[in-house]
A protein has these predicted regions:
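Glycan-processing catalytic domains of CAZymes
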Residues: 1-116, 121-131, 146-151, 155-158, ...
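Structural beta-strand segments of beta-rich domains
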Residues: 135-137
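Amphipathic protein-protein interaction modules
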Residues: 139-141
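Beta-strand-rich ligand-recognition modules
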Residues: 144-238
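Acidic, serine/threonine- and proline-rich intrinsically disordered appendage/tail regions
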Residues: 238-245
């Protein structure tokens, strides 16, 4: 739209998350949103409802959180959570942020029918890893109503099947938090990605295939959440809390 013109595009984000633990986004979620905006050509990034947002989870550290939003260079090495947009419990908030634009999630899983979900990130993880800066990269899916021991899944990232030795499953069936029951009936499939499986800058694709479904269960399985979590070291060979005794 702005090619060969003097116009610039400014990206913006709201501060409504409406998840089970946090109504407002955390710093890592905002940093990821801003990084994606810059990566797609935005000249600046802002929060469009900052004035009336009095319950932000980062108010106590506001300067440290807001400062990186002004520059893609400052954002390059900060921790991020790239969360695929979903439909919040309150549908009037429009999970995409734009009325009329359908959120990507949730998606239903049917046996033998793959679901492809776009996941956009801005980080050049291979470059940062060559500098020794990458601490951990995790791909996380929250699956609803699915019992891992009774159902077989195949999960791929950019056409590479993620092996089970990278997988850790967390059962949320009976998990309570101060806000109440946390995602009852859900399982978190978390892959701690090796460098060969790192997502690339730009659009990536996560494909989830239900290979075999428990024949004794007549209930819809869903992909409820999908995110990529990235943590960095301040510099090579640096750990924040290395002394254990």
């Amino acid at each position: 739209l702005t090619k060969s013109t003097s116009c610039r595009i400014l990206a913006e984000s709201g501060t409504s998350l409406v998840k089970r633990r946090d109504v407002k986004p955390t710093a890592k979620l905002l940093w990821a949103a801003a990084a994606n905006g810059y990566h797609q050509g935005a000249a600046g990034f802002g929060l469009h409802d900052m004035v009336r947002s009095q319950e932000l989870t980062f108010l106590k550290d506001m300067y440290d959180v807001l400062r990186p939003l002004g520059s893609p260079e400052l954002l390059a090495g900060v921790d991020k959570i790239y969360h695929v947009r979903d439909q919040p419990r309150s549908k009037i908030t429009f999970g995409s942020g734009v009325p009329g634009v359908r959120p990507v999630l949730p998606q239903s899983l049917e046996e033998g029918k793959p679901q492809r979900i776009p996941l956009r990130i801005a980080d050049d993880l291979q470059h940062m890893n060559s500098l020794g800066r990458v601490k951990v990269v995790k791909l996380r899916l929250r699956l609803v109503n699915l019992e891992p021991s009774r159902n077989q899944l195949k999960i791929e990232l950019n056409d590479k099947t993620l092996p089970d030795d990278l997988l850790n499953i967390t059962d949320l069936n009976y998990r309570f938090v101060k806000e109440g029951v946390a995602y009852q009936g859900s399982q978190i499939y978390e892959y701690r990605l090796a460098p060969d499986f790192y997502p690339k800058p730009g659009r990536n694709w996560v494909k989830v295939t239900l290979l075999n479904k428990d024949p004794d269960v007549d209930i819809t399985f869903q992909i409820g959440d999908l995110d990529c979590s990235i943590e960095y070291r301040l510099h090579r060979h640096f750990e924040r809390h290395p002394i254990k005794y």
